[in-house]
């Protein structure tokens, strides 16, 4: 394989600011007159993964494709870069955790699990971050919106699919504290991503 293809792929992933699918990488390379089939691109990605093995960076495959990111072991070093505006509130974390595990879910169902009212600002914030979307409306009086997570949420959480989330304890009644606690490992990824975006 042409070593330059590997370097081109690395440049694209570094500069993109978002995950790139294999087909996107191939299309961009072709637009620049660089011939590479999907097999060559996969080899290039594997080589990058090996090259970053001893680095603070890693190549990660998430729901929307491939991206370069900081390894978990180094995300704590970024805390000094976080401003108060970029911090995720406990109530926001509880709400997104409930949506992730119970989706599709209504605002009323979230409030029932949390035991407190969900602020309109939290829902708006999650919609603005593109972490949730409305997937439809429940066939009950008032037809409340059904909320689900998005690919952006999966990308920011560094997972490919929602089933990659840690399993919840097996019992009928699960509190918001247990749900949020289960996803605490991923909280660092969400905060690190917020730093990168702002």
Question: What spans do the regions from the language model cover?
Answer:
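Short amphipathic alpha-helical interaction segments
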Residues: 36-44, 116-128
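Short alpha-helical segments that sit at the start of domains
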Residues: 1-8, 69-93
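A short, conserved structural fragment
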Residues: 49-59, 130-138
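Short, cationic-aromatic polyanion-contact patches
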Residues: 63-75, 137-159
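Conserved small/polar residues in nucleotide/adenosyl-binding loops
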Residues: 188-197
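Short, amphipathic alpha-helical interaction segments positioned at domain boundaries
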Residues: 77-87, 153-172
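Short amphipathic alpha-helical interface segments
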Residues: 13-14, 18, 85-105, 109
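Short acidic, hydrophobic short linear motifs in intrinsically disordered regions
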Residues: 20-28, 104-113
């Amino acid at each position: 394989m042409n070593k330059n293809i590997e370097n081109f792929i690395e440049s694209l992933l570094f500069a993109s600011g978002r995950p790139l699918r294999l087909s996107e990488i191939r299309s961009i390379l072709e637009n620049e007159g660089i011939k590479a089939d999907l097999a060559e691109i996969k080899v290039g990605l594997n080589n990058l993964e090996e090259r970053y093995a001893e680095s603070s960076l890693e190549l990660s495959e998430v729901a929307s494709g491939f991206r370069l990111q900081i390894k978990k072991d180094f995300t704590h070093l970024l805390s000094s870069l976080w401003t108060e505006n970029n911090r995720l509130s406990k109530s926001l974390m509880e709400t997104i955790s409930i949506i992730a595990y119970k989706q599709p879910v209504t605002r009323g169902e979230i409030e029932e699990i949390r035991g407190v009212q969900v602020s309109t600002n939290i829902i708006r914030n999650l919609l603005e971050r593109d972490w949730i979307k409305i997937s439809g409306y429940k066939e009950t009086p008032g037809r409340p919106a059904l909320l689900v997570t998005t690919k952006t949420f999966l990308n920011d959480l560094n997972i490919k699919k929602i089933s990659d989330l840690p399993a919840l304890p097996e019992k009928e009644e699960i509190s918001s504290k247990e749900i949020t606690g289960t996803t605490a490992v991923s909280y660092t990824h969400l905060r690190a991503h917020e730093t990168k975006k702002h």
